[in-house]
Design a protein with these regions (language model features):
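Switch/connector loops and helix/strand junctions flanking conserved nucleotide-binding motifs
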Residues: 79-81, 108-113, 169-172, 187-190, ...
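Conserved SF2 helicase motif VI
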Residues: 185-208
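Short secondary-structure boundary/capping segments
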Residues: 85-90, 176-178, 194-195, 222
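A conserved SF2-helicase RecA2
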Residues: 200-203, 209-222
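Short glycine-/polar-rich loops that comprise or flank the Walker A/P-loop
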Residues: 95-97, 174-176, 203-207
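A short beta-strand element within the Helicase C-terminal
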Residues: 171-184
Length: 222
């Protein structure tokens, strides 16, 4: 193992400031919970930008930097709330995001269509330096073309999947990077296995971010 190139490296996103900023407040008050959640979601958003900057590739057709990442959250409601937050957030002027929620309580037909789409986009087996096959998927190509036509200043496009543990089992997906809300060692290992799952080549910068605390730990801390 020591002779194998490191395909995955991880860093930790510090969440202590959220606890410090809400110390002494009534942690069960709805406005305090919402304030904590907004701060937590903002840390996640910043982490996605950091990982994109380190692990994107250049699409010649649209002339933008593209990456496909996953944010793993423990529960369905935070998954939905985070997806809405990322969609509404003010991103840098040169950055555009496409965000999709993926969890077990979606309508079965929708989930089936969604999984077929994800399987098509995320079966990444290109070699280092090769153009990702995902860029030839019509839906992805259409997104990139539309973004560039409507906003010529855009230089970065992040495709973000916000997923519950349903992503950890039975899916043969390959992401460029991941942001993980921790639950257990097993869940971390399972999700980390979806980063550069099939592609070879060592990474120099961390392509996985672990959040220091999970949402429940921050929400209930007082």
């Amino acid at each position: 193992l020591q002779q194998q190139p490191a395909k995955r490296k991880a860093d930790i996103t510090d969440c202590q400031s959220i606890i410090e900023n809400h110390k002494g407040q009534r942690h069960r008050q709805q406005e305090v919970i919402e304030s904590k959640q907004t701060a937590y979601f903002e840390l996640i958003a910043q982490s996605t930008l950091n990982k994109h900057q380190q692990h994107h590739y250049y699409d010649v057709g649209s002339q933008v930097n593209v990456s496909f990442g996953v944010v793993r959250v423990a529960n369905i409601m935070p998954c939905v709330d985070l997806t809405q937050y990322l969609l509404k957030r003010d991103w840098p002027e040169n950055t555009e995001v496409r965000v999709m929620a993926y969890h077990s309580q979606q309508v079965l037909l929708l989930r089936s269509l969604q999984e077929r789409h994800l399987d098509k986009v995320l079966k990444r087996k290109e070699k280092p330096g090769e153009i990702p096959g995902a860029l030839n998927v019509p839906v992805i190509r259409q997104h990139l073309t539309t973004i560039k036509n409507l906003s010529p200043k855009i230089e970065n496009v992040l495709f973000i999947l916000v997923a519950t543990p349903v992503e950890e089992v039975g899916r043969d997906h390959d992401f460029d990077w991941a942001v993980i809300e921790p639950s257990s060692y097993r869940s971390i290992i399972q999700l980390a296995g979806r980063v550069k799952r099939h592609r070879q080549g060592e990474v120099s910068e961390p392509n996985i971010t672990l959040l220091q605390y999970n949402w429940k730990g921050i929400r209930d801390h007082h």
